[in-house]
From Swiss-Prot:
One example of a Gene Ontology biological process annotation: glycerol-3-phosphate biosynthetic process
EC supergroup of this enzyme: transferase
Classification via Pfam families: FGGY_C, FGGY_N
Name of this chain's protein: Glycerol kinase, glycosomal
Native source species: Trypanosoma brucei brucei
Gene: GK
PROSITE patterns noted in UniProt: FGGY_KINASES_2 (PS00445)
GO molecular function, one term: ATP binding
Length: 512
């Protein structure tokens, strides 16, 4: 039996999952990491904590597999999938981070985005968007780089000395795991920086100059499935656990990894991940589609340096699982995640309330950083069950708006939607989603599709699987999908959407 490992580095934790050649997860270890919030709107991570967590997860998961399988000898290859946009700055001499890493949904760069918009000529910065496929937003890595250069003296000093390295989490992990030998990224992560030309898949000299990001601080861009380097660190006993020099042969941003792990290899196929945020991606084929309706144009995946590049349209929602966690932890509406669906099902509707969970602004397709969390329509009869149900509806309603934009941009209709992520296990949410979209929702029996995507990238490069056709054939043989079909009337659907649109108008609260 051959095994492939996947480092799944997310917003709240790091995991290492080992898959066998039948695409089944056979060993896993997970370690949470600290969420640092030094100021309102800020969220940052300790890069060294993330690196050590990854190493710990690898060592423990491998040890667990050795106990299960006495014949286990090696991991054929390792893939990495990661929270995108979160940006690390480090010194190439010391190999140590120069500050904590601003996370993808951190809002500290709002003033930087206003400054950059002015520098690019004002308006909606269409010049840059036509290169990158992205709007100017606090979301993307380039603005975090610019903020660090202007506000962190150690970063500015390293830049002057020529020792500064910038990278997203994939780059940071590969750099540290390889002992500083691999300073690389992949096309999906690079496409989320606001510095990569989407058509050429190379850094744009013009944008780097305009945003004042020195190109020498950026890593080499590669495909998602090829040799990136070898694991050479012995942090937490990783080298000893692996038993031999193990190649890193896959790297892919988390949402693209979920697209790949959900087998969306063909044009028009789409997936949604219900995680901390909510992320819908549609494969639009080998030609980039530039959105006119508030979506992101991005790289979907590229298998091999000379392989075709498949592009995607993406709609990102900031708060999905984060909304459920807010209700549990901050508001004490329930004590365990399993109670969420039960309470929401205890009422037939929301009794007229609408919840807009814009805790850190609204992303696609609205792009409104001034929006804040809003609940409208409450009365003395409103209960926690109504609020919880309204929160689930809000997640589905935001996704419905994203799908509407995607249909207009891609000129393609959804025939079904593949889903993954923790909230895909919430049956009521899946029912609401199917009814709003009017298509079947396909829920996989094997929920680790994000980690699987990176493992597939690594395994394809290592020869564990020889083609996408073989990957799909194995998946059809080994995995199954539950279908959730639409229900309810068109009148109910339209009424829900109309109330949602009215509630959105009331969310502009923050004075930025």
């Amino acid at each position: 039996m051959k095994y492939v490992g996947s480092i799944d580095q997310g917003t709240t934790s790091t995991r290492f999952i080992i898959f066998d050649e039948r695409q089944r997860p056979v060993s896993v270890h997970q370690v949470p990491h600290t969420q640092h919030t030094p100021h309102p709107g800020w969220l940052e991570h300790d890069p060294m904590e993330i690196f050590r967590s990854a190493c710990k997860c690898m060592s423990v998961a491998i040890a667990k597999l050795r106990q299960k399988d006495a014949s286990f000898r090696k991991i054929e290859a390792i893939g990495i999938t990661n929270q995108r946009e979160t940006t690390v700055a480090w010194d190439r001499v010391t190999k140590e981070p120069l500050c904590y890493a601003p996370v993808w949904n951190d809002l500290r760069t709002y003033d930087i985005t206003k400054k950059v918009t002015a520098e690019l000529g004002g308006g909606d910065s269409m010049f840059a968007s036509k290169i990158t496929g992205l709007p100017v937003s606090t979301y993307f890595a380039a603005f975090k780089m610019r903020w660090m250069l202007e506000n962190v003296p150690a970063v500015a000093d390293a830049c002057r000395r020529g020792t500064l390295c910038f990278g997203t989490i994939d780059t940071w992990l590969m750099y540290k795991l390889s002992g500083g030998k691999a300073f690389v990224t992949d096309v999906t992560n690079a496409s989320r920086t606001f510095l990569m030309d989407l058509r050429t898949r190379k850094w744009s000299p013009e944008l780097c100059e305009k945003l004042k990001i020195p190109m020498e601080t950026l890593p080499e861009i590669r495909s998602n499935s090829e040799l990136f380097g070898y694991v050479e660190t012995d942090e937490c006993g990783v080298a000893a656990a692996l038993n031999e020099r193990t190649p890193i042969m896959g790297s892919i941003g988390d949402q693209q990894s979920a697209l790949f792990g959900n087998m969306c290899f063909e044009k028009g196929e789409a997936k949604n991940t219900y995680g901390t945020g909510c992320f819908l991606l549609m494969n639009v084929g080998e030609e980039a589609r530039f959105s006119k309706h508030g979506l992101l144009s991005t790289v979907g995946f590229q298998v091999g340096r000379d392989g075709p590049c498949y592009y995607a349209l993406e709609g990102a929602i900031a708060c999905a699982g984060a909304t459920v966690e807010w209700m549990r932890r901050n508001m004490n509406l329930f004590s365990h995640i399993t109670e969420c669906e039960k309470l929401a099902r205890s009422v037939p509707g929301t009794q007229g309330i609408v919840f807009v969970p814009a805790f850190s602004g609204l992303l696609a397709p609205y792009w409104d950083p001034s929006a804040r969390g809003t609940i409208v329509g409450m009365t003395l009869k409103t209960t926690r069950a109504h609020v919880i149900r309204a929160a689930l509806q809000a997640i589905a309603l935001q996704l419905n708006d994203v799908v509407g934009s995607m249909k207009r941009d891609a000129g393609l209709n959804l025939s079904s939607l593949r889903v993954d992520g923790g909230l895909s296990k919430n049956g009521l949410l899946m029912e609401i989603q199917a009814s709003l979209l009017g298509v079947d929702i396909l829920v996989p029996s094997m929920h680790e599709t994000t980690a699987l995507g990176a493992a597939l990238c690594a395994g394809l490069a290592a020869g564990v699987w020889t083609s996408l056709e073989e990957v799909k054939a194995v998946s059809r043989r080994e995995n199954s999908w539950k279908t959730v079909s639409p229900s309810g009337s068109a009148m109910e659907r339209e009424a829900m959407i109309a109330e949602w649109r009215e509630a959105l108008k009331r969310t502009k609260w923050a004075k930025l």
